Amino acid sequence: MRKKIDVILTLCEPYRNYGYSFRFDVSGDLDKDVNRILVLLSDALLEDFKSRAQGLTQKDDDKAVVYATGMRNGMTAQQRLDRHCSRLRYILEGWIAISFVLGWNKQQTKAKIMRYLNNPFGIPEWADALFDSRYMATILAEGDLNRRTGLMNSILASMSLVGEGVINDTYCYEAIRKMAEAGVERYGVRRGSDFPCNACDEVCLHTYPITQIVVPVHPRCVCQTFPVYSDD
């Protein structure tokens, strides 16, 4: 991610004179290049997550990973990463506009970005920019487009959560597949922690056919599965 952010900052250098008016779309070529770089970032993250997930499988096929990166609550892992990269785009655009107005050089801007990437709106100069109507960067002119959407402020944490979900889904898929190969027809779920979670508690109340996968209940779910036999 550092290298791709560095490339974006370099591409933006010729547009310093735009100052308050800076947006990625001040140039069609710049806009396309930034989008291309962020697509590459999203693809690279997904490949990394898939590679790590593949290490959890005992099979030569990739069914578990295909399942884990597939549709969940209306979005695939790729779509979730694309969404977070789109969020990163707007945040970078705002930071770069601020850096041009305040006269930061590229290294100062990069240092600020990396320092505050876990809390992108924690940069002290951000609050001042939000109340300055001269800025044209989308996120500064219109506010956070993801406010009240349930998404975390931290782009890094959001992307990491996608990876956790892929790995957790793969692990659970493999656990249930092993039971199926052993002839188990139904399984149950038990809590793997005492952290309060009504959704996990509800899932643990029932047993399920081996063809139905109900775990993980959420990306950081640590619930465990166990075989259920007819005489249990």
Whereabouts are the PLM-identified features?
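Acidic, glycine-rich two-metal-ion catalytic cores of nucleic acid-processing enzymes
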Residues: 139-232
